[in-house]
């Protein structure tokens, strides 16, 4: 593991709203002024039938960031809707390139703060529907902008992203000790319980205290992650009442005894939905442990369905390292788009 194999996964970072095409052409993402549709701009020309109505490009700016017990936490505002982008792009003396970002900083959550606690009832509005979403995403490296950019590109509903880079990826996200994947790899320390405590007692209260507004609608929390962070997200649903949704993309569900644990352990709290995905070639590996990932994922998916959780499984082409940000974005998009069932 400590040598760049499988779970030592570095995210694919793309500049916000920009991609490089073959031949050096640039593609930027803009919002269609008549809808929330995202369209491509190649070499300065919008590829949309009504290019003159396109809005200025939206580039997210973090709300704030902080360090806690070796973890780095970066909080991104909810993406503005098409109407918000339009308002930000309208002419006027006060308009400038930062209007879209300022709009989201002023209206980032509209949700509750840490004073309300983090139990099961702190996730839905009076009508039983989620009104504001916060996604807590553990990342191997970076600040989560690559995933946020993909979410915007594929039309994900607005949400506040909390990207958490743990102090030690291999140790902090694993539920119990396990030998390394290969003979010369360092064992996994199994400190997920400590990371969950940090999340519940330090990170969530601080984030929602900074973002929250008194007497505003309640929020839905999703815990999400790729690879070992996907394992952690799945394990969290069985150990914490803080979250109503999980999104595990290419999760390390090969982890020894985890599928059995997921089958035999009741949910810590009823949850609205669970998302799992796996690459079609992920089980094709020299590692004996990693070869169990497909079987383990199937068993975990079946376990969540048997608990009455609306569960989605998606198979993606390729191995563990293909398009991780896009895979994670697809999971987040599905999870926060579902109807609240935990009434």
Language model features with spans:
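Alpha/beta-hydrolase fold nucleophile elbow
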Residues: 213-225
């Amino acid at each position: 593991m400590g040598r760049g194999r499988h779970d030592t996964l570095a995210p694919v970072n793309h500049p916000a709203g920009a991609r490089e095409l073959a031949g050096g052409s640039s593609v930027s993402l803009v919002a269609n002024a008549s809808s929330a549709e995202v369209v491509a701009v190649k070499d300065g020309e919008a590829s949309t039938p009504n290019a003159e109505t396109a809005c200025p490009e939206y580039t997210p700016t973090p709300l704030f960031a902080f360090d806690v017990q070796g973890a780095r936490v970066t909080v991104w505002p909810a993406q503005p809707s098409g109407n918000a982008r339009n308002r930000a792009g309208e002419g006027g003396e006060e308009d400038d390139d930062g209007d879209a970002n300022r709009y989201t900083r002023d209206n980032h959550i509209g949700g509750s703060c840490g004073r309300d606690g983090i139990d099961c009832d702190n996730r839905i509005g009076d009508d039983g529907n989620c009104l504001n979403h916060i996604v807590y995403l553990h990342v191997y490296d970076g600040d989560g902008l690559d995933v946020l950019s993909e979410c915007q590109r594929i039309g994900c509903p607005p949400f506040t992203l909390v990207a958490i880079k743990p102090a030690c990826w291999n140790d902090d996200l694993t539920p119990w000790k396990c030998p390394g994947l290969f003979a010369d790899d360092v064992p996994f320390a199994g400190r997920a319980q400590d990371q969950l405590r940090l999340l519940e007692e330090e990170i969530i209260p601080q984030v929602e205290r900074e973002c929250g507004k008194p007497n505003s609608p309640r929020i839905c929390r999703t815990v999400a992650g790729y690879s070992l962070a996907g394992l952690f997200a799945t394990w969290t649903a069985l150990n914490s009442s803080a979250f109503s949704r999980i999104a595990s993309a290419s999760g390390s569900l090969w982890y020894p005894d985890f599928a059995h644990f997921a089958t035999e352990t009741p949910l810590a709290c009823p949850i609205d939905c669970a998302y799992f995905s796996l690459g079609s070639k992920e089980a094709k590996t020299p590692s004996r442990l990693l070869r169990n990932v497909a079987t383990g994922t199937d068993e975990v998916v079946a376990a969540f369905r048997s608990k009455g959780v609306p569960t989605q499984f998606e198979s993606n082409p390729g191995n563990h390292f293909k398009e991780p940000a896009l895979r994670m974005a697809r999971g987040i998009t599905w999870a926060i788009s579902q109807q609240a069932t935990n009434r």
